[in-house]
């Protein structure tokens, strides 16, 4: 069940959903707007000749911080990691989805490549996979609305929520834009017959 504005407010009051800072004015009819933090990670193109999700490529991205009153310029075709200003915490009965803002999409800004789903039990800043698919550079301002989260009530609480010992939760408690940890417990099925 997708939560309405009144359900989001009730879930926050009951401790099922937490966003810090909590700003009730960000609540929309069936979502809550989230804002952009001032930290970004860019690919260090000179450190590696390729990307391998099975390897720890610790220097693949480099973190940058902009001043709160200065924009980050995302150039055409560029990809960067950002994060929400809000620290998000979901209990075992709530899952969420991050979606982009329509107004930014119309400027060519994508807020996530594939990872828009947020598991029940997650807590941390949401890492954004920012892309500029327009033909012009776009200014991204710290504190601006960058996306919206919608919330889903599970039919029953997750038995093993994100962050539990059995789920291999690589991003629990993440602060700021967090690089890929795909190499941790990398899985590749044997597909030979």
Curated annotation (Swiss-Prot):
Reaction catalyzed: dCTP + 2 H2O = dUMP + NH4(+) + diphosphate
Protein name per Swiss-Prot or TrEMBL: dCTP deaminase, dUMP-forming
CDD domains: trimeric_dUTPase
Broadest EC class assigned to this enzyme: hydrolase
HAMAP family linked to this entry: dCTP_deaminase
Gene Ontology biological process terms in this record: dUMP biosynthetic process; dUTP biosynthetic process; nucleobase-containing small molecule interconversion
Record's subunit section: Homotrimer.
Catalytic site: 129 (proton donor/acceptor)
Swiss-Prot/TrEMBL keywords: Hydrolase, Nucleotide metabolism, Nucleotide-binding
Pfam families: DCD
Metabolic or biological pathway: Pyrimidine metabolism; dUMP biosynthesis; dUMP from dCTP: step 1/1
Protein residues bound to dCTP: 101-106, 119, 127-129, 148, 162, 174
Purpose of the protein: Bifunctional enzyme that catalyzes both the deamination of dCTP to dUTP and the hydrolysis of dUTP to dUMP without releasing the toxic dUTP intermediate.
Family annotation (Gene3D superfamilies): 2.70.40.10
Coiled coil: none
Alphabetized NCBIfam families for the sequence: dCTP_deam
Keyword Nucleotide-binding: yes
PANTHER family on file: DCTP DEAMINASE
InterPro entries: dCTP_deaminase, dUTPase-like_sf, dUTPase_trimeric
Site (Important for bifunctional activity): 116-117
Protein family (similarity comment): Belongs to the dCTP deaminase family.
């Amino acid at each position: 069940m997708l939560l309405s504005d009144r359900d989001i407010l009730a879930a926050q009051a009951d401790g099922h959903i937490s966003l810090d800072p909590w700003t009730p004015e960000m609540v929309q009819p069936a979502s809550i707007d989230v804002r952009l933090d001032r930290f970004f990670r860019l690919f260090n193109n000179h450190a590696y000749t390729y990307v391998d999700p099975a390897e720890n490529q610790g220097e693949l991205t480099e973190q940058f911080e902009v001043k709160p009153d200065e924009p980050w310029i995302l150039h055409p075709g560029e990809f960067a990691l950002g994060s929400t200003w809000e620290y998000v915490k979901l209990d075992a009965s709530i899952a969420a989805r991050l979606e982009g803002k329509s107004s930014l999409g119309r400027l060519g800004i994508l807020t996530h490549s594939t990872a828009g789903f947020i598991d029940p039990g997650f807590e941390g800043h949401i890492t954004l996979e920012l892309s500029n698919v327009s033909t012009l550079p776009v200014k991204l301002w710290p504190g601006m609305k960058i996306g919206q989260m919608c919330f889903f009530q599970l039919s029953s609480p997750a038995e093993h929520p994100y962050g539990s010992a059995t789920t291999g939760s690589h991003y629990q408690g993440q602060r700021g834009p967090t690089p890929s940890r795909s190499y941790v417990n990398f899985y590749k099925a044997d597909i030979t017959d």
